[in-house]
Amino acid sequence: MIKEIKQDGEARMQKTLEALESTFSKVRTGRAHPGMLSGVMVSYYGSDTPLNQVASVNVEDSRTLLVQPFDRTMVQAIDKAIREADLGLNPMTADVIRVPMPALTEETRRDMQKLARGEAENSRVSIRNIRRDMMNDIKELAKEKEISEDDEHRASDDIQKITDKYIETIDSRLSKKESDLMSV
């Protein structure tokens, strides 16, 4: 009973961590990486389609992404989608699309850092909410006399250790992201 509660809670915490990683991958650091364009939707025969389904996105060099459409007729639509995605990117179009990364100004770096801190805080809150749910489940079991008081305290300590581990992981990922952002 307790084991299932802990496993379920830890799985939810892991998903929160994965969501944070996904969000962090979209925050610009001045270096090119394909994940930056993962949220771009292209109008493909009347329906919005993720960019990675109509083109391959590769890193050409540390400051340039190379977008190669599977269908040559999609070049203009992909170019338009990247420009309208509000990422501050200005693609250059030929047979393939080159997306140079503009250098980040100090102000932009600070804004990106604030964004990263905000996302990390949201993840911490989410982890704490999961902990609260787990603790409530444990207290409910103790209230119904399905587990002993000792088991309740032991489970509470374990849940707190799991929570601390995930909060620490979030903090370390945030500090890594901040150092990436502030390195020129």
Swiss-Prot record:
SUPFAM superfamilies linked to this entry: Ribosome recycling factor, RRF
GO cellular component: cytosol
UniProt entry tagged with the keyword Protein biosynthesis: yes
Recorded GO MF terms: ribosomal large subunit binding
Keywords of this entry: Cytoplasm, Protein biosynthesis
Annotated compartments: Cytoplasm
Any GO BP: cytoplasmic translational termination
Paired cysteines (S-S): none
Family the UniProt entry places it in: Belongs to the RRF family.
Biological function: Responsible for the release of ribosomes from messenger RNA at the termination of protein biosynthesis. May increase the efficiency of translation by recycling ribosomes from one round of translation to another.
NCBIfam families from the UniProt entry: frr
Record protein name field: Ribosome-recycling factor
Organism: Psychrobacter arcticus (strain DSM 17307 / VKM B-2377 / 273-4)
